[in-house]
Regions:
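N-terminal catalytic cores of secreted or lumenal carbohydrate-active enzymes
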Residues: 25-43
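Catalytic domains of carbohydrate-active enzymes that cleave complex glycans
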Residues: 34, 126, 142-144, 148-149, ...
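Metal-dependent polysaccharide deacetylase catalytic core of the NodB/CE4 family, i.e.
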Residues: 37-129, 150-153, 197-200, 265-272, ...
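Active-site-adjacent pocket scaffolds in enzyme catalytic domains
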Residues: 48-52, 76, 117-221
Length: 442
């Protein structure tokens, strides 16, 4: 029986309170003393603060663990969703690159860490623009995502490998007031998954409210450095939490159903896979799978629809093979052919020559004076590549694959969530995330 991969992940974020840094130290040392490496996802501003506060003890403790990124400024407005919810993708993307490059610089300067394997967005900041930016920055994994399956299979979306957060210790009352029975029941639930992330916010072991709920809810409530401290928990609650955290770690280590791992180990395993290549001998199998369903393929390799689109273009133009790379979906909703049409092989080849070789995909395509959708074009292209001289297409075909396996992305609606500002409208983010479904693959 395949073991469940279990990751211990820590949203290490409170840059407003030196007291909260004590919790980072405690949780890091609990794991180290049990022989387990955690993944501490650090906010860039907190990395600076740990240096400013002289917290060498915390920085030394973190060196045992994997260090990753939890954005530059977490909840400081405008947060990632607020500044990327604009029509101009290039402007949104560039600002993510600017801020998150600075975050990594701060994290590395403070901790001395090497490669960053995962980016964890704060709260509900699920921005397609950030996902593309992280991929292009060389960060291979995006965690606390809405683009994982309910079973924890993982998968690529916007060119990053997506892993869902599953069990948050500080969000479960039993970690503060319960004990072994509740912990064993939680492990039973996690063991049903292929992969599970157990996570904490270290500051919440000492405080009863999140630091950003008192300082950054909707607005930046105070000048930087003049923050409120969140209400503290009774000491006995904190102690019970730490006892239960240690117990959870021990029981997970002893449980043969689990294999404890890190984001880095998963990323290295994924990176070791051979290049994904669409070969001429694959075209008939691809055509048959696309006839069955407009959906990413798992054979002959892991291919997203954007991979297949670029490969079809290349093969129509005479290529023998196409090596897949980072791809993109759509900036606007793709539009189907409005009525049935017949396309010739020569028209398809001419249209391929006019298509861009990279970047976002076109929402509509002209083929011999007929306007069709990208899915219409994709299916017709593979028919031609398999020998057809003419291809009939239907009108009104669905242009996007089903997101039922990624139901959180399918149902995403970000307006009014988390600490977003009153002016945040979600004019683009939720829809554009769904329009990137052509980059989904497993």
């Amino acid at each position: 029986m395949e073991k469940t991969e279990l990751i211990f992940s820590f949203d290490t974020e409170d840059f407003t309170s030196n007291k909260a840094a004590d919790a980072i130290l405690t949780e890091a040392e609990i794991l180290r003393s049990e022989g387990v490496r955690g993944c501490f996802c650090l906010v860039g501003l907190l990395a600076d603060q740990l240096v400013n506060w002289g917290r060498k003890d915390v920085l030394d403790a973190l060196r045992y663990h994997e260090i990753d990124s939890h954005t530059l400024a977490h909840s400081v407005h405008p947060v990632i969703n607020e500044y990327t919810d604009i029509e101009n993708f290039d402007a949104a993307y560039s600002e993510v690159i600017r801020q998150e490059t600075e975050a990594i610089r701060k994290i590395r300067r403070a901790t001395g860490c090497g490669k960053i394997y995962v980016a964890v967005p704060p709260g509900d900041d699920k921005s397609y623009a950030a996902m593309y930016a992280y991929a292009d920055m060389g960060i291979p994994i995006y965690a606390d995502t809405v683009c994982d399956t309910p079973e924890g299979d993982g998968g690529w979306y916007c060119n990053v490998y997506n892993i869902e957060y599953v069990l948050g210790a500080d969000g479960e009352d039993f970690f503060f007031r319960g004990g072994e029975a509740e912990i064993r029941a939680a492990l039973d639930r996690l063991a049903r998954r292929k992969r599970a992330v157990f996570y904490t916010h270290p500051h919440m072991s000492l405080f009863s409210r999140h630091w950003d709920s008192v300082n950054y809810n909707k607005i930046n409530k105070h000048p930087f450095g003049e923050w409120e401290e969140a209400p503290r928990r009774p000491a006995e609650e904190s102690e019970r939490f730490y006892e239960n955290l240690r117990l959870f770690v021990r029981l997970a280590k002893e449980d043969p159903r689990f294999r404890i791992t890190t984001y880095g180990e998963i990323a290295e395993r994924l990176a070791a896979r051979p290049p994904r290549i669409v070969r001429k001998e694959d075209l008939r199998l691809i055509r048959e799978r696309l006839r069955e369903k407009l959906y990413p393929l798992t054979e002959p390799d892991s291919f997203c629809l954007s991979d297949l689109f670029r490969a079809a273009r290349a093969h129509l133009l005479g290529a023998e093979t196409w090596e897949c790379r980072n791809e993109r979906g759509f900036l606007y909703a793709p539009e189907a052919a409005k009525e049935p049409a017949v396309l010739t092989a020569e028209e398809l080849r001419r249209s391929a020559a006019a298509l861009p070789a990279s970047g976002f995909l076109p929402e509509r395509i002209d083929v011999g004076g007929k306007t069709i959708g990208p899915a219409d074009w994709l299916l017709a292209a593979y028919e031609v590549l398999c020998g057809a001289e003419t291809v009939g297409i239907e009108g009104g075909r669905e242009q996007l694959p089903s997101l039922d396996r990624l139901h959180l992305a399918r149902d995403l609606s970000l307006k009014g969530t988390w600490i977003h500002s009153y002016s945040f409208e979600d004019n683009w983010l939720s829809d554009r995330l769904r329009w990137q479904s052509w980059t989904m693959r497993f």
